Amino acid sequence: VVIDARKEEVLILAPTEAIETADSLEVAFSDSAVLPGAVKQTDSRMGLTMIRVDATSLDDAQFEKIKPVKLGNSYGVRQGDLVISMGSPAGMVHSSSYGFISYIAKNVQMTDGNARVLYADIKSKADAGTFLFNTEGELVGWATDRYEQDVDTGMKTFMSISDYKGALELLSNGIQVPYLGIEGQEVTSEMEKNGMPSGIY
């Protein structure tokens, strides 16, 4: 998805897994223009990469067709909401799908904090790049397979974009997202019986 569009630099967010083995990058736009791209910054923890494209070779008419996505408020997403997945949800570029939010997991533990995970009955292919939109056309999440259940329920998982807006700004400016690598775990009663005092470890 296009995050920002200026002639000197168009910024595109993509899953790292989709491009990490590529020797070079080429970005195709809707009017069939193809331009070379380069990695601006990568977030290894979340598996996302910001790609930059120099669009100064495009004329004004071509450039005006490049529209950055509007970031939505994923905290406002509710169970039962209609959502649309775009990108490569069917494993093919420019495919799309629609479905409903089935469940929202709040405060899911992850490295250095918590995040929301959205579950939807919708087609999605995380490694090829699938992004989740609300009915206003706003980006509310991106596909991940890290939190999918072992049993195939048909539910696909998406990370909340609102939890990631600060990191997205860093990537857009070519700044590495800092992480301490802390993963919290609640001390269970069984662990307490074995002599581990309550606290954060």
What are these regions (language model features)?
Residues D31-A33, T42-M46, D112-N114, N173-Q176, ...:
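Short flexible coil/turn linkers enriched for glycine and charged/polar residues
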Residues G37, L139-S198:
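C-terminal cap/linker of serine protease catalytic domains
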Residues V1, P36-A38, S96, F100, ...:
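Residues located in well-ordered beta-strands
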Residues V10-A14, G37, I51, G80, ...:
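Terminal peptide-recognition signature
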Residues V77, V83, Y98, G129, ...:
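Extracytoplasmic/secreted envelope proteins and their assembly/folding machinery
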Residues I3-A5, K40-T42, I104, K123, ...:
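Residue-level recognition of beta-strand microenvironments
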Residues T56-P68, S97-T157, S198-Y201:
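Active-site region of chymotrypsin-like
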Residues D4-G87, G91-M92, A126:
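Conserved active-site neighborhood of the chymotrypsin/trypsin-like protease fold
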